[in-house]
């Protein structure tokens, strides 16, 4: 093996040049992908030992690099001899996991013209080959083992050097990279063929590319070899790092590209409860912090009055004497039971005997807003300690209720005269224990009702009962000999049962007995007794509980053998009297809420007013007929704790206030994404009633294609309606965003569900009044659901006028609604026909840019919307049926649902081409619309839009006529270079107006 000190001048010349270039080359700079080195000749400090044939061809020489490290190179320079065929074969190279292999060559090459006498024999290229094998061919064997190698390429130098370059020490090193593959065997040899060049191989580097091991999205991905095909991506599943977890059904994945780069990350991992993300790993929440769910990115400090003493806490425990309610989320502060109510006061009314209480809220609410009050009534003896008391029992009535009071006042009825009562008022909240009402956090008063006659019903004796008289007796309320015992006077009130208590008779007596005369035979009477006791003034006490006594019949006192016909007659008359009384009550009865159809006329309302109907499950409860809307809402909607609703972002303003997206966390249920409608603080009383009416309306519906009400929040300063979250928003906007991405069959598939929902509503007797695609919401799984239930009869006045947003309710309203303000299920059918047209037209505005007044006139003249592009004929005929002028001729929703379901299952085959199908005539062909003025040119049209700056752009693009402009699309405007969104929107609006003008002139409407 020769070195750089060899005697041959050409070799010495080549050796010096090659070594100087190698020193300047330095270490190779890697790319962004990871390269797995299979061979690097510069890394070998020993002889390479490659096979050279013949022996006087390629030769190995040694030198040093810039770090004085030895490097091995091969050179050949037999340029003066013809017919050169010198081969150099590397050792066996294992391909490892690589299939697509890269070969990087660094070499120098002498310019043949700079070598005297070598013009006919010198070459400036050399060839590179490879041969796949399963094992090493070995050294010293015949060239490449006799097998046929595959040529990689003929290599030429970009720059060659001359004698002058060598003298000036100019370095001209060439680098070429070639790739081979895909390889299938375990390894391969490289071979270099010299055909007469003066060349030096400074470096041979063989490698394949792989995506380096990495951590992304808290998932580790192993090093992965790239595929051989350039367009092939290798999907690699990631492994979540410690203390993290993947999303269910969406494990973390990435794709390794052919160039060794990671592409298309899908999914990610989230730190488990108790851990938070810190770079590429999850760290435990420190003491004092917690994380309850993987959905939360960071640990949160413990809420007030709670603590977390350990690392990785998933919740914070409450401090001593503090607690959380079962309905409180883990993020809620710990609270405690309230203190006792303050300043408990009472007033006692003697006639009737009524005890009224009022108090102030506790000084300490425990940190909660859900403070309620509970009353405990104890009846005590006239003498003795309060410990001798016993519960009052069911006799005493509490208004408005005994427990769960939010009011700070209560009234007790049916107390006994001459008794002593102790009433305790306890303050409770969400963390009060079950025995809190009997605990120590209460205020109490003790009240004596004074002497009286606390008789039970069985303490009044029926001494004698005759056809026209009744004798009663009772015990004296004050024992004989006690002060005032002889001064007690009694009042006895009586009346016929079934008669009003206002038509009673009264007798008085000084003894505990009485005989009442002049009664009717065989008649049931009600008797009540009370005592008047002495004092500074005679105090009238309340009457005792009523007792009933029936006088005997005339025949009963004379003969027991009297015919039973008289008894039957008396009973019959009594029954008729009772029935008459009941009917009288029903005749004047007024119920707080009316059940019936939401769209009935005045005659229907009269009928409902005078006839009682038992409400059924499928009968709509009209909010306008309810006296107490809040109470009605609680009958149909679940009351939610405001703390269970977390607001995340605003979705804009609603009819009554803010509309937000949030999360609902209920005990035992997963967190749910919801839409929250909040009533603004400045809302008027009428807006508050409208808000409650919308909640009551939503709460009555249970259908898979009607927006679901999750609950309401009515306790607190902010009223909320919580519904399911529909991620794709309104149907019209969804269709516009996906125009051209859905085929006609997919569009038609949206309609049967909506028809089913309207069938459900019509069967309940509900009239929507505002049916339109903008009031249909689309969920994340592309289910359409009816919404927009906040409209009512008060909204009728807007039916004719165009709104500021460009939406005119006249576009969806039936003729009878526009003319007479009459809403019915049939008017909803008309609106549903417009919805079907909107769906098939990808959310296009009905009647294009026609004003509300023009639409009213056109519909009255018989104009109907033409079929949208690719709309099946059967579906358009159904639309026309929905747009019949006579409401009685329109189909019912049950029929519409049946027809649409059959269309989806068995679509109508086209009967003719779109261009040959006959179109019915339209009366609009002969009538001009004043709404759309005529323009003489494109320039005049642009000036009318105040966008004349684009005249040259339109002209340069060939849009010289209004007919051509009418066919433009949004993409055409972008291609003109119109970058401002507001200008594009103004132009699109003007183009739509031109299209409507063209349709008017061409008569593309439909006459009915």
UniProtKB/Swiss-Prot annotation:
The keyword Protein biosynthesis does not apply. It holds the Pfam family SAM_1. Residues 35-216 form the Eph LBD domain. InterPro entries: Eph_TM, Ephrin_rcpt_lig-bd_dom, Ephrin_rcpt_TKs, FN3_dom, FN3_sf, Galactose-bd-like_sf, Ig-like_fold, Kinase-like_dom_sf. Residues 645-900 form the Protein kinase domain. Gene3D superfamilies: ephrin a2 ectodomain (2.60.40.1770), Galactose-binding domain-like (2.60.120.260), Immunoglobulins (2.60.40.10), Phosphorylase Kinase, domain 1 (3.30.200.20), Transcription Factor, Ets-1 (1.10.150.50), Transferase(Phosphotransferase) domain 1 (1.10.510.10), Tumor Necrosis Factor Receptor, subunit A, domain 2 (2.10.50.10). Its EC number is 2.7.10.1. Mainly expressed in testis. Residues 587-1008 are cytoplasmic. The keyword DNA repair does not apply. Residues 933-997 form the SAM domain. Residues 1-33 form the signal peptide. Residues 322-342 are annotated as: Disordered. It is linked to Deafness, autosomal dominant, 88: A form of non-syndromic, sensorineural hearing loss. Sensorineural hearing loss results from damage to the neural receptors of the inner ear, the nerve pathways to the brain, or the area of the brain that receives sound information. DFNA88 is characterized by postlingual, progressive and severe hearing loss with tinnitus. This is Ephrin type-A receptor 10. It comes from Homo sapiens (Human). The lineage of its organism: Eukaryota, Metazoa, Chordata, Craniata, Vertebrata.
């Amino acid at each position: 093996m020769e070195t750089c000190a060899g005697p041959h001048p050409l070799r010495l010349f080549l050796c010096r040049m090659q070594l100087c270039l190698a020193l300047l080359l330095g270490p190779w700079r890697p790319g962004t992908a990871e390269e797995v080195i299979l061979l690097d000749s510069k890394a070998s400090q020993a002889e390479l030992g490659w096979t050279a044939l013949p022996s006087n061809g390629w030769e190995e020489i040694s030198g040093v690099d810039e770090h004085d490290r030895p490097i091995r190179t091969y050179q050949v320079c037999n340029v003066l001899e013809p017919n050169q065929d010198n081969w150099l074969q590397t050792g066996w190279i294992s391909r490892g996991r690589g299939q697509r292999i890269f070969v990087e060559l660094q070499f120098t090459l002498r310019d043949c013209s700079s070598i005297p006498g070598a013009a006919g024999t010198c070459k400036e290229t050399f060839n590179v080959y490879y041969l796949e094998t399963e094992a090493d061919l070995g050294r010293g064997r015949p060239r490449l083992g006799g097998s046929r190698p595959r040529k990689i390429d003929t290599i030429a130098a970009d720059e060659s050097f001359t004698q002058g370059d060598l003298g000036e020490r100019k370095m001209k090193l060439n680098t070429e990279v070639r790739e081979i593959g895909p390889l299938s065997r375990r390894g391969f040899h490289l071979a270099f063929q010299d055909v007469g060049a003066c060349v030096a191989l400074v470096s041979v580097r063989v490698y394949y590319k792989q995506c380096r091991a990495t951590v992304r999205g808290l998932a580790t991905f192993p090093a992965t070899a790239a595929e051989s095909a350039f367009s092939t991506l290798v999907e690699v599943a990631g492994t979540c790092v410690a203390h993290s977890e993947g999303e269910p059904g969406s494990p973390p994945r990435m794709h390794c590209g052919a160039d060794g780069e990671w592409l298309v990350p899908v999914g990610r991992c989230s730190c488990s409860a108790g851990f938070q993300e810190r770079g590429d790993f999850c760290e435990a929440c420190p003491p004092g912090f917690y994380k309850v769910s993987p959905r939360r990115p960071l640990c949160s400090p413990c809420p007030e009055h709670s603590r977390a003493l350990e690392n990785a806490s998933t919740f914070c425990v409450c401090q001593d004497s503090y607690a959380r309610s079962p309905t409180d989320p883990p993020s809620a502060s710990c609270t405690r039971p309230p203190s006792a109510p303050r300043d408990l006061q009472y007033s006692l009314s003697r006639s009737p005997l009524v005890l009224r209480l009022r108090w102030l809220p506790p000084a300490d609410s425990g940190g909660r807003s859900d403070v309620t009050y509970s009353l405990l009534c104890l009846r005590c003896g006239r003498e003795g300690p309060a410990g001798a008391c016993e519960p009052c029992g069911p006799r005493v009535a509490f208004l408005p209720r005994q427990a769960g009071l939010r009011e700070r006042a209560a009234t007790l009825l049916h107390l006994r005269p001459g008794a002593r009562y102790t009433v305790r008022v306890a303050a409770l909240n969400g963390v009060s224990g079950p025995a809190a009402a009997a605990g120590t956090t209460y205020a109490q008063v003790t009240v004596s009702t004074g002497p009286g006659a606390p008789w039970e019903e069985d303490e009044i004796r029926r001494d004698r009962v005759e056809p026209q008289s009744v004798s009663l007796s009772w015990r004296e309320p004050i024992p004989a000999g006690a002060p005032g015992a002889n001064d007690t006077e009694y009042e006895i009130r009586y009346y016929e049962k079934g008669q009003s208590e206002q038509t009673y008779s009264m007798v008085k007596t000084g003894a505990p007995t009485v005989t009442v005369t002049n009664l009717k035979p065989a008649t049931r009477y009600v008797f009540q007794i009370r005592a008047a006791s002495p004092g500074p003034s005679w105090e009238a006490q309340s009457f005792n509980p009523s007792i009933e006594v029936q006088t005997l019949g005339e025949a009963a006192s004379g003969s027991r053998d009297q015919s039973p016909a008289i008894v039957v007659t008396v009973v019959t008359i009594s029954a008729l009297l009772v029935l008459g009384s009941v009917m009288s009550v029903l005749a004047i009865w007024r119920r707080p809420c009316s059940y019936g159809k939401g769209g009935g006329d005045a005659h229907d309302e009269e009928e409902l007013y005078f006839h009682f109907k038992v409400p059924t499950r499928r009968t709509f409860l009209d909010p306008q007929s309810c006296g107490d809307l809040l109470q009605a809402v609680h009958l149909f909607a679940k009351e939610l704790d405001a703390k269970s609703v977390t607001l995340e972002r605003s979705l804009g303003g609603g009819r009554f206030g803010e509309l937000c997206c949030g999360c609902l966390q209920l005990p035992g249920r997963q967190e749910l994404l919801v839409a929250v409608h909040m009533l603004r603080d400045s809302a008027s009383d009428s807006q508050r009633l409208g808000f409650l009416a919308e909640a009551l309306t939503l709460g009555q519906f249970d259908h898979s294609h009607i927006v679901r009400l999750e609950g309401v929040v009515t306790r607190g300063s902010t009223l909320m309606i919580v519904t399911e979250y529909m991620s794709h928003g309104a149907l019209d906007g969804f269709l516009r965003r996906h125009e051209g991405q859905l085929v006609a069959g997919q569009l038609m598939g949206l309609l049967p569900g909506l028809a089913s929902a309207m069938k459900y509503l019509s069967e309940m007797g509900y009239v929507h009044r505002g049916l339109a695609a903008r009031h249909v919401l689309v969920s994340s799984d592309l289910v359409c659901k009816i919404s927009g239930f906040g409209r009512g009869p008060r909204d009728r006045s807007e039916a004719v006028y165009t709104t500021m947003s460009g939406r005119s309710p006249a576009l969806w309203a039936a003729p009878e609604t526009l003319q007479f303000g009459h809403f019915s299920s049939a008017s909803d059918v008309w609106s549903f026909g417009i919805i079907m047209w909107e769906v098939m037209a990808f959310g296009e505005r009905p009647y294009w840019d026609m004003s509300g007044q023009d639409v009213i006139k056109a519909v009255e003249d018989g104009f109907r919307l033409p079929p949208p592009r690719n709309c099946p004929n059967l579906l358009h005929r159904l639309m026309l049926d929905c747009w019949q002028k006579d409401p009685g001729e329109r189909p019912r929703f049950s029929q519409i649902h049946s027809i649409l379901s059959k269309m989806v299952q068995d679509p109508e085959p086209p009967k003719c081409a779109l261009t040959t199908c006959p179109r019915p005539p339209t009366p609009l062909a002969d009538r001009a619309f004043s709404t759309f003025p005529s323009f003489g040119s494109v320039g005049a049209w642009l000036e009318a839009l105040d966008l004349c700056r684009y005249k040259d752009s339109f002209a340069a693009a060939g849009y010289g006529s209004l007919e051509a402009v009418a066919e433009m699309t949004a993409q055409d405007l972008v291609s003109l270079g119109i970058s401002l969104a507001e200008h594009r929107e103004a132009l699109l609006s003007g183009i739509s107006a031109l299209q409507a003008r063209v349709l008017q002139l061409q008569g593309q409407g439909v006459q009915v």
